[in-house]
């Protein structure tokens, strides 16, 4: 994958593709990023991150993906490292530019607090 990202960064034709993709997804990506920022915690180098990392990654994913079968991509990292944010941005790019159907799921969608788990266990133990 590193070689693909390097190729995309160096190739003039791929730079044009990257720019074309960026122009199409920029508004949606920046709007999403803005919704995630707080006054104290602003994202740095937003456009650079999208153009230099996310778009090349999405080109790689799109080459691997088959519209007829599911293709799974996983992101791992500790709490608060940006997995949900990055996966949301990848989804925006893959759906808006590459016209792929994307289903994003987060482990946070399944997480319950200790109190919630205890409550649920009481219901199931009755």
Model-found features: residue ranges?
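Charged, amphipathic alpha-helical linker segments immediately N-terminal to NTP-binding catalytic cores
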Residues: 1-52
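Conserved nucleotide-sensing/catalytic segment adjacent to the nucleotide-binding pocket
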Residues: 41-47, 103-106, 110-126
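Phosphate-binding P-loop
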Residues: 63-70
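Hydrophobic anchor at the beta1->P-loop junction of P-loop NTPases
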Residues: 73-75
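P-loop (Walker A) phosphate-binding loop of NTP-binding proteins
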Residues: 78
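ATP-binding Walker
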Residues: 81
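Post-Walker A helix-loop "phosphate-sensing" segment adjacent to the P-loop in P-loop NTPases
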Residues: 92-103
């Amino acid at each position: 994958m590193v070689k693909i990202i390097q190729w995309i960064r160096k190739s003039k034709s791929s730079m044009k593709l990257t720019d074309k993709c960026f122009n199409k997804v920029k508004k949606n990506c920046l709007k999403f990023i803005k919704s995630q920022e707080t006054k104290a915690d602003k994202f740095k180098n937003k456009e650079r991150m999208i153009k230099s990392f996310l778009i090349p990654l999405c080109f790689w994913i799109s080459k691997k993906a088959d519209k007829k079968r599911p293709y799974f991509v996983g992101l791992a990292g500790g709490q608060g490292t940006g997995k949900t944010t990055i996966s949301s941005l990848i989804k925006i790019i893959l759906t808006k530019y590459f016209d792929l159907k994307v289903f994003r799921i987060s482990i946070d969608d399944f997480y319950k607090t200790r109190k919630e788990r205890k409550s649920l266990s009481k219901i199931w133990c009755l």
